[in-house]
């Protein structure tokens, strides 16, 4: 109500100012013909001015809306990595045969530049997980994911993620892996074909989560240095990472 009243007062004030200016022009020059001429000339450009203002405002509103949506999405992504993602990456890393290259490329630090993040993303685009799984690891992943199943369901229901196809793909991959593991009472004595199937599901989720993790780290580095600091100190790719600040 207060906003509406403010707009009405603003409109009346601007209209009154226009009337006063034209009245002043007439009183000064005593030429009604020219006053009406210029008034109509100004009115002729009003539709064009309105169009330009509308286009500009629409552009600004779209930009603001996009920024707001991205901020909400990144908050949701942050919840995922805090509650599920970081721990899951730690398990995936244990299955990776070529773990040394992965750790070398993704040992993020507070000194990483935008260029270094881009190099990391290029590495991930060419990265193909080479995982080794056994009944013990499958059991650990099953226990970990089932304990966080409700968190995954809530994330899938979040409407803010509809515009983020890659992260949605990641959630579906993790959720599918969870379902596959849940429906197996035991992992002992599984045929080689079934182990290969689970290996493929693990590799799919693994590859997607690594890419989203690095993209999220870049976001934190740019916008939230204090959150990036703790992410560096809990980096699942760095076996020497420690939460305590030592220097």
Give the positions of each predicted feature.
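Membrane-proximal, non-transmembrane interface segments of integral membrane proteins
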Residues: 63-151
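Soluble C-terminal extramembrane regulatory/interaction domains of multi-pass membrane proteins
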Residues: 137-247
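Membrane-embedded hydrophobic alpha-helical segments
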Residues: 7-63
């Amino acid at each position: 109500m207060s906003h509406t009243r403010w707009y009405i007062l603003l409109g009346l004030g601007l209209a009154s100012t226009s009337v006063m200016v034209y009245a002043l022009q007439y009183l000064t020059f005593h030429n009604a013909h020219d006053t009406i001429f210029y008034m109509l000339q100004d009115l002729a450009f009003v539709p064009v001015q309105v169009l330009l203002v509308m286009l500009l405002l629409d552009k600004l509103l779209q930009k603001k809306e996009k920024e707001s949506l991205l901020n909400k999405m990144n908050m949701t992504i942050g919840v995922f990595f805090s509650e599920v993602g970081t721990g899951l990456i730690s398990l995936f890393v244990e299955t990776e045969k070529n773990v040394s290259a992965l750790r070398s490329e993704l040992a993020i630090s507070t000194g990483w530049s935008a260029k270094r993040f881009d190099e990391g993303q290029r590495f991930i685009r060419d990265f193909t997980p080479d995982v080794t799984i056994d009944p013990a690891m499958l059991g650990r992943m099953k226990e970990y994911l089932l304990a966080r199943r409700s968190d995954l369901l809530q994330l899938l229901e979040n409407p803010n993620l509809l515009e983020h196809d890659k992260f949605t793909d990641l959630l579906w991959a993790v959720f599918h892996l969870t379902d596959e593991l849940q429906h197996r009472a035991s992992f002992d004595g599984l045929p080689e074909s079934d182990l290969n199937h689970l290996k493929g599901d693990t590799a799919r989720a693994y590859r997607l989560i690594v890419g989203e993790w690095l993209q999220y780290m870049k976001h934190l580095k740019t916008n939230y240095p204090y959150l990036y600091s703790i992410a560096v100190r809990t980096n699942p790719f760095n076996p020497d990472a420690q939460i305590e600040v030592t220097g």
